[in-house]
């Protein structure tokens, strides 16, 4: 029986060989993006600069380059960043639904809700149950205790965060890959005001909860803002097979949108500024700002899961 990592690698390779099958390549070319392969890690990516040689991963570039230099058109509070996304997507026909519980009582393979797509696995994704809407958005509180060692190190990790979902459930003929991709691309450029030249889009694959598919990761200045997964497959003992529905699973860290719009040293200063100030006051902690600002742009490279 093949493991999930092996299956993900197979899908990633198929997508690399035939990107038109999985990705919105017509939209990318319409926007003036070209496909390249990272000279450092070998990953395929799309960028406005046709001569670009490296992908957007912080390990392949200069870490976080948005610190003290936010690329967005305005600074957003944590509440405002959700409201901006919600208004933008509702105007485009998505239904905004309420969050699900963080205890995943409808599943027998996990205890906690770890991402927005968990809310719909396995029964909605498999077609056994009706979705609350065919095209929806959701601000889903998510728990990830496997990230404990990264909290406070990378500047972006939490054990309790909000995964904003753009989720769609459609029959094959009704599934509109180009539109779903365009909606998120234009939210980034028009909604957040990030210049197209800042966007680096990675081809990859994702799997979890018994499903998997190719995906497109959106990077800006060394930070992955969100990941749009084209969840077309169900994992089986023999490998994987196509789902009856075509499922879109975009997951965006709410905290990262707030962070990149503020350009603070870590996301915590943007998401919970009052809490941090209170903690400094209570502990008497004084931060060496010069050392802090030199170190934190490179904290992106300290993901415990990815370093030796």
Predicted regions and their residues:
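Short, flexible, mixed-charge glycine/proline-rich loop motifs
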Residues: 25-34, 44-49
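Cysteine-rich micro-motifs
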Residues: 49-63
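Short cysteine-rich clusters marking metal-coordination/redox-active sites
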Residues: 38-41, 55
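Structured aminoacyl-transfer and RNA-binding surfaces used for tRNA recognition/handling
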Residues: 66-308
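Short, intrinsically disordered terminal segments enriched in charged and Pro/Gly residues
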Residues: 1-29
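Short acidic-hydrophobic surface loop/beta-edge motif
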Residues: 36-39, 216-218
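Generic signal for short, ordered secondary-structure residues
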Residues: 17-20, 24, 34, 67-68, ...
């Amino acid at each position: 029986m093949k493991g999930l990592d092996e299956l993900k690698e197979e899908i990633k390779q198929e997508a690399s060989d035939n990107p038109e099958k999985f990705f919105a390549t017509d939209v990318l070319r319409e926007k003036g993006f070209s496909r390249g392969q990272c000279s450092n890690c070998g990953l395929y990516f799309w960028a406005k600069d046709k001569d670009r040689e490296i992908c957007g991963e912080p390990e392949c570039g200069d870490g976080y380059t948005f610190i003290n230099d936010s690329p967005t058109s305005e600074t957003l509070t944590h509440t405002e960043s959700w409201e901006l996304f919600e208004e933008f997507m509702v105007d485009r026909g998505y239904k905004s639904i309420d969050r699900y519980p963080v205890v995943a009582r409808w599943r027998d393979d996990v205890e906690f809700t770890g991402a927005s797509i968990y809310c719909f696995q396995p029964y909605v994704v498999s077609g056994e149950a009706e979705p609350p809407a065919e095209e929806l958005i959701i601000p889903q509180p998510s728990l990830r205790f496997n990230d404990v060692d990264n909290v406070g190190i990378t500047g972006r990790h939490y054990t309790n965060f909000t995964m904003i979902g753009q989720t769609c459930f459609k029959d094959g003929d009704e599934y509109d890959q180009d539109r779903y991709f365009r909606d998120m691309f234009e939210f980034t450029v028009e909604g957040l005001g990030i210049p197209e030249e800042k966007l680096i889009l990675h081809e990859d694959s994702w799997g979890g909860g018994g499903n998997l598919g190719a995906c497109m990761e959106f990077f800006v200045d060394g930070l992955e803002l969100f990941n749009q997964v084209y969840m077309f497959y169900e994992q089986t003992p023999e490998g994987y097979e196509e789902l009856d529905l075509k499922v879109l699973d975009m997951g965006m860290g709410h905290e990262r949108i707030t962070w990149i719009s503020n350009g603070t040293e870590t996301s915590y200063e943007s998401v919970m500024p009052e809490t941090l100030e209170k903690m400094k006051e209570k502990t008497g902690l004084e931060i060496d700002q010069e050392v802090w600002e030199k170190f934190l742009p490179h904290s992106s490279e300290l993901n415990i899961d990815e370093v030796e």
